[in-house]
Amino acid sequence: MEQRHWKKAGITTSLLGYGCMRLPTLPDGRIDEVRAEALLNTARDAGVNYFDTAYPYHGGESEPFVGRVIAKWPRESFYLATKLPLWQCDSLEKAQQIYRSQFERLGVDTIDFYLLHSLHRARYDQAKALGIVDWLWEEKKAGRIRNFGFSCHDNADGLEHILRDQPWDFCQLQYNYLDTDDRAEEIAGDRGYALTEELGIPLIIMEPIKGGTLANLPPDAAAPLTALDPAASAASWALRWVGSHKNVHLILSGMSAEEQLADNLSTFAPFRPLNAAEDAAVAETARILHSRIKIGCTGCRYCMPCPMGVDIPDNFSIWNRLGMFGQPDAVRHQWTARFPDAEKASHCVRCGKCEAVCPQHLPIRTALAQLQTELDAL
């Protein structure tokens, strides 16, 4: 198992970390604890020593489940990470209440990596004003937290504001070979990665396979990769691309099935950084996927709020997923079962306020009508 050394912390973790957000589930939605525990045990036996959970994962059941599993392991054999859901913390007292409950749910006295969950600039500033950030540094001094950091869903400007404000032990970003542009509202991209390198802040990567979408590529997009290695999975290319960046200390993958775990273990044992030809092939795959985009929305949200309640960027995100990856069944489920009807493109009255402020000068009204027709037809 490939390992990475954390110089400041003086520890060594597996490069692959187990994300406990997408564990296998039963038909009623509860965690399939027999299968999930077997997966975690298999990962640990193969050398994975970092396990990541969070207060809200699996409807609040991930932390207690992980706690029951790790109770059977020697404490020194793994590193545990969890996160504070700041959107549920309107006061320092509420944050402290949740924090204390996490130790009980996990059954531990110390948490190795503690994160402020899903930060953007405004959420960070609020947490700081409430005293939550200073209090957690005190918790680290007391030894209840060993490493203090955050996960971030903001662009590079927002990330830089947060990074430069504290002596963080680490940070966690979404990064993959498609999410390299920092213009989108929630993506720091290449610029965000470069910031962590410049500041010497160890980086943990989430969504290296972009929620699984980079594991199922259309044939034309996969062609540059399969030409070099027909046997390699699409997921392995995405993971190797991320792991080839020198400041990446750990890559999280939310493995929900045995075959996913087996494939990832083979990617990381042994791990092979991309060579020049392989890096060029991944870049060509990314170019092909970007060429299939339906509309060049960057997710900047200058068009929001829509007076009719249409979530314009999220409509475009689903439409672009269909264009880039196909996957009509997955897109249909997202559109019909998970996307609120009140926010769909059908509510557009063509007022044009969105187009007046769009920095990309996109034909938003025409595109909304087209996407509604295409997605409804799935």
Q: What are these model-predicted stretches?
A:
Residues 1-78, 135, 141:
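N-terminal binding-site loop/beta-alpha segment at the start of enzyme catalytic domains
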Residues 103-124:
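Active-site groove signature of glycoside hydrolases
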Residues 30-43, 91-106, 153-162, 234-239:
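Short, acidic/polar
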Residues 119-298, 302-310, 314-317, 326-340, ...:
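Beta/alpha (TIM)-barrel catalytic core signal, keyed to glycine-rich beta->alpha loops juxtaposed to Asp/Glu
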Residues 6, 18, 43, 51, ...:
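Conserved, mostly hydrophobic/aromatic
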Residues 325-353, 377-378:
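Short Fe-S-cluster ligation motifs
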Residues 22-34, 83-93, 122-125, 222-229:
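Active-site mouth loops of central-metabolism enzymes
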Residues 294-309, 345-361:
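Local cysteine-cluster metal-coordination motifs and their immediate loop/turn environment
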